[in-house]
Amino acid sequence: MKKLMGSCLLLLSLMLISTFSVSAATKNPTKVNLRIGSSRQNVYKSYDVTGDSKVDQFNIALGLNGKIDKKDSNGYYNNIFISINDKTYIMKSATYFYGAKASLYTLANGKPYLYIDAITDNDYHAVFGLFNYDKSKKKMVTAVNFTTLFNGYAARCSGDIVKISGNTIKVRYGLMCYSLGGCTITYNYTYKNGKLLRTSYYGTLVNISKGQHLTKLLTAKRTLTAYKAPGTTQKAFTIKKGAPVKIMQVWRKGNSMYIKLMYGGSYGWIKAATANTSQQFSDVMYVG
């Protein structure tokens, strides 16, 4: 009888251990839309956000000046609080915002990223990008900042995830470009050596806003010089004022940005404008 009791207890122990192991391990869906609430609301307990393939307990809340769940008299925040397994990480913003949205994206290799978009007035973005937990630093870090890629060449920039394929993320940027006005450009980022990196300097132009229409056909507002390749000084041709062109592609590297276009059947690259006072095309929508 004692042997039978001992065998039953051993079997029960093994079942408990097995059950705990199964519940502790998890595999995230590719995308999970998250709710941002107070520090006591929307606590998630079914997903891995630290990248160790184990379930984490986490939630995302907003706050003001280091105080969670607080906002100013106008309803604005300047902090995002990410609480993971009883530890809280604060994202501070120099710009006040009135709300935020978040999603959890996971690559094929199991690496999770939090997508956070804190929205402020006039469609600007105070905090906007992909964030991940850095095990060596033991804190949340920025993986991709959507607001900085086109610094110096756009008045504002936003971005969203349009596709995940394996370990590659396609990001669609919406920007108010000094050269093209309102336009949409996509870049791919792939996981390599522990980081999300752009796969190319060449971005795909999706469209340009031309009034109520989307297009790639524009008209030169002034004489423009086209080069044979981005970053070179070899001239390809000169575009006359008033001439029609077709915008093809963009190139962004370091502090430089070039735009590929077709003019009279020939292809060339122009330097992107760095200020909206030096407009290159006459029929695009510019908003400051």
What positions do the PLM features span?
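Sec-dependent N-terminal signal peptides of Gram-positive bacterial secreted proteins and lipoproteins
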Residues: 2-24
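Glycine-aliphatic tripeptides that mark coil-to-beta-strand junctions in extracellular
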Residues: 53-57, 111-112
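SH3-family beta-barrel domains
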Residues: 195-228, 241, 274-288
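SH3/SH3-like beta-barrel superfamily modules
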Residues: 238-287
